[in-house]
């Protein structure tokens, strides 16, 4: 692999291309997440239409149906909507755990110089929206402040679905930045959920959960992918984490962290983490997340006082955090990084491109809705939170589309250049002749 460290005295380029293997991996992720984002949008639209139709009562009845009333002893007498949030999203977070470990072991995040930009941007994109939300809700205080983390999340599947719709050929360096930013964003979201949105904490079940997680890790470290052993261990780990009061999706992340990234034998084409990610990402993007979106997005606006909704400090804080906070946090932190270091934008990238990507990061659908449910579960603000997340994400998507559509011609020129392979060795020329 070509050394990407710039020579002394040369400015480091922000959003430069990754290596060719990393580019191929990102392309595979993009295809799956874009398709999944389309299904996510479809699920959300169906839920909204159904919940606001004359048959809205049947939607509510379906979401509140408890398939296993006898599971109360294990606290598993959950309705379908909760099973989607706690159960199916564990698959999503398992893939996130695999992705995180891969990025830190073999991806861009293993290099501190390349990791600095997405990490700083993700932190900025978390702090500023949270501050905006707190600022708006500070006078209200009390329960309102529990929602501070709602506008801090980015939904990469939704963002990529928007990109697919507007047809933008986003440069490879920016695609890598957007995906890596989302990975770091997911890590921060997992940390926030585990620390700030834990219910009645019980230490014993959490300690017991370490046993099936350790056995799961022992098997995968030895490359034993017996589904009849791994899936029951994962279910037991999920059940114990759920019983502990920590949100059950954290079990998915911990299981993902145990999977080895590097190839075990010389003949292996891929590490086990990449293999499992390739197998489970379609399940996550094509089923788990769309079903969660279907149950989470069904907010009924019939009979609602729209004036009261749009002036609710919770709604204003979430929308402002997603639309303004993400842009100020990501764009601002990147600008400051370039301003106070020798870093500069890659030749193919403009600050307008970064503005569009920063707006895309304001689409905070899946994890924002999840945090909203944890912060205001069963409360009067629950529907307002859903409406705010949907509204803020829609505004961010529209603004990003306006900015990025104007750059389409330039994107196409870059895309053509990134496909040129003059010596026909299967590796485009731009990945062989990079000046960092």
Curated annotation (Swiss-Prot):
Pfam family membership, one: Na_H_antiport_1
Function statement: Na(+)/H(+) antiporter that extrudes sodium in exchange for external protons.
Record's keyword terms, sorted: Antiport, Cell membrane, Ion transport, Membrane, Sodium, Sodium transport, Transmembrane, Transmembrane helix, Transport
Catalytic activity as recorded in UniProt: Na(+)(in) + 2 H(+)(out) = Na(+)(out) + 2 H(+)(in)
Family from the record: Belongs to the NhaA Na(+)/H(+) (TC 2.A.33) antiporter family.
Source organism of this protein record: Salinispora tropica (strain ATCC BAA-916 / DSM 44818 / JCM 13857 / NBRC 105044 / CNB-440)
GO cellular component: plasma membrane
Protein name: Na(+)/H(+) antiporter NhaA 1
GO biological process: regulation of pH
Membrane-crossing segments per the record: 35-55, 80-100, 116-136, 147-167, 176-196, 201-221, 226-246, 283-303, 313-333, 354-374, 385-405
NCBIfam families: NhaA
Location (main, coarse): membrane
Membrane protein topology class: Multi-pass membrane protein
Cellular localization per UniProt: Cell membrane
Record-level Gene Ontology MF annotations: sodium:proton antiporter activity
Chaperone keyword on record: no
